[in-house]
Amino acid sequence: MAVLSAPGLRGFRILGLRSSVGPAVQARSVHQSVATDGPSSTQPALPKARAVAPKPSSRGEYVVAKLDDLVNWARRSSLWPMTFGLACCAVEMMHMAAPRYDMDRFGVVFRASPRQSDVMIVAGTLTNKMAPALRKVYDQMPEPRYVVSMGSCANGGGYYHYSYSVVRGCDRIVPVDIYIPGCPPTAEALLYGILQLQRKIKRERRLQIWYRR
């Protein structure tokens, strides 16, 4: 009967197993020493990156952030689009305003005057002769203003892309926020584009502290 005096195994009596257990204990101690000598044991574990917005560092930033949230909530909940129908896509735009989809439940109400609108839906083929009128209507809209390009013709010319009289995309005349593909896009697609515009407005940050302007 033999007693093995190895660290971690004091007081354990092993019967005839000195030769078999000894190398295992030595190997265990070697592995422990290598693990403790490695660089991973001395460096603390770094926390994982989190996709969370940074907290405001001052009361001023906190107030401005909350005001931004309030203004964005009011703005995205009361979008007033200006109808600028140029071709067959305008029929689907009217379909979205009909009772089946009822865009009024999202706060979207059509206005006849650009001075009362904050969204312009360009639906259809934009020609070179109509481009100045489009820009004039856009300039009459108050800030902040948004543009939704509806259909392939408004996005890039569509079926008439190679025509000499067609503008290859209304974004060459006015800045576009939302592109809706299709020829023509359905009323569901236009409604989805309006919801995406609301999400974009929700993330906007327009207010700034006076000393950071």
Curated annotation (Swiss-Prot):
Coarse class of the primary localization is: mitochondrion
Query: What binding details are noted for the cofactor?
Result: Binds 1 [4Fe-4S] cluster.
Keyword annotations from UniProtKB, A to Z: 4Fe-4S, Electron transport, Hydroxylation, Iron, Iron-sulfur, Membrane, Metal-binding, Mitochondrion, Mitochondrion inner membrane, NAD, Oxidoreductase, Respiratory chain, Transit peptide, Translocase, Transport, Ubiquinone
Pfam families from the xrefs?
Oxidored_q6
Q: Name one GO biological process term.
A: mitochondrial respiratory chain complex I assembly
Give the Gene3D superfamilies listed for this entry: 3.40.50.12280
Point out residues bearing the modification Hydroxyarginine. R111
Q: How does it assemble?
A: Core subunit of respiratory chain NADH dehydrogenase (Complex I) which is composed of 45 different subunits. This is a component of the iron-sulfur (IP) fragment of the enzyme.
What's the stated role of this polypeptide?
Core subunit of the mitochondrial membrane respiratory chain NADH dehydrogenase (Complex I) which catalyzes electron transfer from NADH through the respiratory chain, using ubiquinone as an electron acceptor. Essential for the catalytic activity of complex I.
Q: What is this protein called?
A: NADH dehydrogenase [ubiquinone] iron-sulfur protein 7, mitochondrial
Supply the source organism's classification.
Eukaryota, Metazoa, Chordata, Craniata, Vertebrata
